[in-house]
Amino acid sequence: VVLLLGCNFFNENDSLEGLGLERHPYIGKELRTDGYYLATKTHKNMPGLIVLYRNGVCLCTYVENSGKSTKQYIENDVLQNKSYMHRLWSKPTAIGVFMITKRTVALRTWEYQNKRSTIAIDNVGEIINDTTLRINTIARTYAGVQQFVYNVYHFVPFSNKPDSTTSFIK
């Protein structure tokens, strides 16, 4: 069973809060984009997953493991599951944009709020080196409340990342 937090069943008429952050191609070398970042801590027994793309798009979510090794599960059952990834990219949730300023990384993604709308979520942290980042805060824009998480993510090389094309990010 594959479960990514934030998956929902939106249609074109549903409410979609704007990200408020423009997508810009990432040309830096502060973080690697030829793989994914995996959290060292879990949230409700699910590890955090961040995938960064050179076009400025990101995937930021938690994955549920079905008993396999986490790396094997993420690579085979999540990232290489073409039909699942197609459904994920066609819904406005867990996807967004990122930007890097000096040693700060900011990811803004959508999250499912209720059956008919999404909200923007900010994950902000610091770059330790090109293979390690730490998310310090998560803020939900509608609530104006920050959650301090201090979750370290380590890079895992992976050359077969799924395409990042989505109609929700221009």
Question: Where does each model-flagged region fall?
Answer:
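Lipid interaction determinants
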Residues: 7-95, 101, 106-170
